[in-house]
Amino acid sequence: MATPQRLTDPEIQTALGELGGWSLQGNKLHRQFKFANFNQAFGFMTRLALVAETLNHHPEWSNVYNRVTIDLTTHDAGGITELDVKFATKANSFAD
């Protein structure tokens, strides 16, 4: 599979405008999700793990009780790509 192309700054800003709750931290998309309890947070991560495998694109993430923090970047491309935007979009849809 070819390495995806890194998005330009205007493309990243457009994506952020469409991705509620996400921000830019360095060269990563960043968001913290809050759930009612640990079970919901872990269930969210489990569903997203299947997406990560399907996309062959794995997040930097952590879980503390009812919070899940996600940072997305494509290391091979040296920044944010469409894969990161796809993953963030899916994360938002699972959190709603």
Curated annotation (Swiss-Prot):
Cystine connections: none
Record flagged with keyword Transferase: no
Recorded catalytic activity of this chain's protein: (4aS,6R)-4a-hydroxy-L-erythro-5,6,7,8-tetrahydrobiopterin = (6R)-L-erythro-6,7-dihydrobiopterin + H2O
Keywords: Lyase
EC number(s) recorded for this UniProt protein: 4.2.1.96
GO MF, one annotated term: 4-alpha-hydroxytetrahydrobiopterin dehydratase activity
CDD domains in the cross-refs: PCD_DCoH_subfamily_b
Protein family according to the UniProt entry: Belongs to the pterin-4-alpha-carbinolamine dehydratase family.
PANTHER family in the cross-refs: PTERIN-4-ALPHA-CARBINOLAMINE DEHYDRATASE
NCBIfam families with a match to the protein in the record: PRK00823.1-2, PRK00823.1-3
Name of this chain's protein: Putative pterin-4-alpha-carbinolamine dehydratase
Source organism of the structure: Synechocystis sp. (strain ATCC 27184 / PCC 6803 / Kazusa)
